Every structure is written in structure tokens, then in C-alpha cells.
């Protein structure tokens, strides 16, 4: 069943209808329209926890989409799925790829920082102080980038940077 028919959330339905209208009036290619439909279906599946279906849709959208900016969001969402599945190394790869295409994507910087922070906590639990410090320092650098791009966001990260003395470290 197409994802469109499964969607019963009013806001999602409204977004879908508006997106379809915009796609009809904007001068876009058939591939761009198809890519957007796959991307939209991927987001819908992802929001329902249907990660395998979401990945299928995202990979198809990626195959069709040529615009680097739009590709960055598709790749970023693929990273989100891998992170949700605990595949942090793979998630990092996709977040970095999204930043190569769109270096002004604060959420990718934030999610990279979250993974490094998590790895720092795990290393601290194992009493591996060198690894813990290294991971926390990496997290700090990525959070600084996220905060630079979106200064009103990531308040918890800002507080962590302040309390750990990493806010002004270069």
C-alpha cells in the first residue's frame, strides 16, 4: 500500500496535499518529483518506526535526487535510522556525508557530537580515561559547530560545554 494511503494524521495529510500542489506548479523534472515522493514516504515510514521501509524509500530518493542540498537531507535521515538502530559508526559515515554536501546542517553536527559523547561515557565506564577525554573533546568540537550555526538551539550541549570547561577551548 502506498504510504500516502496509510497516513491518517491531519497535519501529515495537509503537508502531503500541499506538497503535491507545489510539485504540480513548480517546474521540476519527473525524477525530482519522484525523489520527493520517495523522501516523503521515507519520512513517514521513519516516523512510524518502519526503518527498513524508510531506508528503501531514502535509497530510492537518493538514486533519483541530483540536488546536493536535497541529497544532504536524505543522507542525514539515513544516518538517523542507523543511529536509532545503534549502528553508530555507520550513522557517523552518513552524517559526515551529509555535511560534505551541506556544511550548514547543525543537526548533523549535533548528532555526531551525541555519538562521540556517548562513546566518551562508555569509555569512562570502562575507566579508559584517555579514550573518554578524546571522545568528549570530539563531541565538544562538533557541538561548537552546531551551536555556531544555530545559537538558540542545543541548550543542553551549551550547558555541558560550560560545565566541563570546553566552551572556549580551541
Swiss-Prot record:
| Record's subcellular location | Plastid, Chloroplast thylakoid membrane
Q: How does it sit in the membrane?
A: Peripheral membrane protein
The residue spans of each TPR repeat are 35-68, 72-105, 120-153
Query: Which UniProt keywords are given for this protein, alphabetically ordered?
Result: Chloroplast, Membrane, Photosynthesis, Plastid, Repeat, Thylakoid, TPR repeat
**Superkingdom, according to UniProt?**
Eukaryota
The protein's matches in InterPro entries, at most eight in alphabetical order, are given as:
PSI_Ycf3_assembly (IPR022818), TPR-like_helical_dom_sf (IPR011990), TPR_rpt (IPR019734), Ycf3/AcsC/BcsC/TPR_MFPF (IPR051685)
The record's Gene Ontology cellular component field reads: chloroplast thylakoid membrane
Q: List the disulfide bonds.
A: none
Record GO biological process: photosynthesis
Give the family this protein belongs to, as stated in its UniProt record.
Belongs to the Ycf3 family.
Q: What does this protein do?
A: Essential for the assembly of the photosystem I (PSI) complex. May act as a chaperone-like factor to guide the assembly of the PSI subunits.
This chain belongs to the protein called: Photosystem I assembly protein Ycf3
Q: Which organism is it from?
A: Gracilaria tenuistipitata var. liui (Red alga)
Organism ancestry = Eukaryota, Rhodophyta, Florideophyceae, Rhodymeniophycidae, Gracilariales
Quick one: which gene encodes this?
ycf3
Amino acid at each position: 500500500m502506498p504510504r500516502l494511503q496509510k497516513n491518517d494524521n491531519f497535519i501529515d495529510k495537509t503537508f502531503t496535499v500541499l506538497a503535491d500542489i507545489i510539485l504540480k506548479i513548480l517546474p521540476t523534472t519527473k525524477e525530482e518529483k519522484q525523489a520527493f515522493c520517495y523522501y516523503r514516504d521515507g519520512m513517514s515510514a521513519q516516523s512510524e518506526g518502519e526503518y527498513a521501509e524508510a531506508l528503501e524509500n531514502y535509497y530510492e530518493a537518493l538514486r533519483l535526487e541530483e540536488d546536493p542540498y536535497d541529497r544532504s537531507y536524505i543522507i542525514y535521515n539515513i544516518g538517523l535510522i542507523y543511529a536509532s538502530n545503534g549502528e553508530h559508526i555507520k550513522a557517523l559515515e552518513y552524517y559526515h556525508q551529509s555535511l560534505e554536501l551541506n556544511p550548514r546542517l547543525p543537526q548533523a553536527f549535533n548528532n555526531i557530537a551525541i555519538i562521540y559523547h556517548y562513546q566518551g561515557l562508555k569509555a569512562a565506564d570502562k575507566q579508559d580515561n584517555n579514550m573518554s577525554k578524546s571522545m568528549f573533546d570530539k563531541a565538544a568540537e562538533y557541538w561548537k559547530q552546531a551551536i555556531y550555526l544555530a545559537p538558540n538551539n542545543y541548550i543542553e550541549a551549551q550547558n555541558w560545554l560550560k560545565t566541563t570547561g570546553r566552551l572556549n577551548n580551541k
